[in-house]
Amino acid sequence: MVRQVPFPELEFEQPIPRRLVHRAAVAEVFVTDAVELSRDRYLVAAQWPRDHALYHPDPSGLADPLLFAETIRQGLVYLAHSRLGVPLAHRFVGTHMDFRITHPERLRVGAAPPAVVLDAELSRPGDRPPHRHGLRLDAVLLVDGVPCGRGGLSLFATDERRYRLLRGPIGRPAADGDPAPDPGGGRGGGPGG
């Protein structure tokens, strides 16, 4: 079954390169495309898996709403690299995220993946390039062209040296003598990737 795509200008065929959203595996990449509507407004296309190692449908067959949160994160990181020129080596640190599903029935998992689109506004609060990029993405979630949620993410991107200063040395003993955990397995995990 092929769904009618309400945004013909967007591609949904394959994910973008995983390095552009700081993911280790292609299966973790949901964003497929983005188009600029105006200076700070974008449409970001995504394809959500019907099931996933981290995101499972609930017993009633609705997609995990955390897919929306991860799509916002990936959309912001992708736009930062592809449209704003934030270097690929920069680390992202999330500072605030909020999201709300307004019409959960639109998240029903069907025979074919839905056309997921973020109608997104990108702003740059606290921006101080080239070493620190303050970014915020506010998005309306559209599933098959119908609005069904809204959310936003604030983060900043910084170079490796400043990131290490902020986070401290990995593996340094904590106050109780145990080594501090590696935040993200050494690859920039957490909300910002």
What are these regions (language model features)?
Residues 31-32, 94-96, 148-150:
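Hydrophobic residues on conserved beta-strands that form the core of alpha/beta folds
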Residues 37-39, 90-94, 146:
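A generic structural signal for short, non-catalytic loop/turn and secondary-structure boundary residues
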Residues 62-66, 118-120, 170-174:
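Short, low-complexity, polar/charged sequence segments that are solvent-exposed and flexible
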Residues 97-146:
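Hydrophobic beta-sheet segments that form the core/acyl-binding groove
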Residues 126-174:
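Mixed-charge, glycine-accented linear interaction segment located at domain edges/termini
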Residues 44-50, 88-99:
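A short glycine/small-residue-enriched secondary-structure motif
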Residues 1-60, 156-193:
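Non-catalytic linker/capping segments at the edges of enzyme domains
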Residues 63-89:
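Active-site helix/loop of acyl-thioester processing domains in fatty-acid/polyketide metabolism
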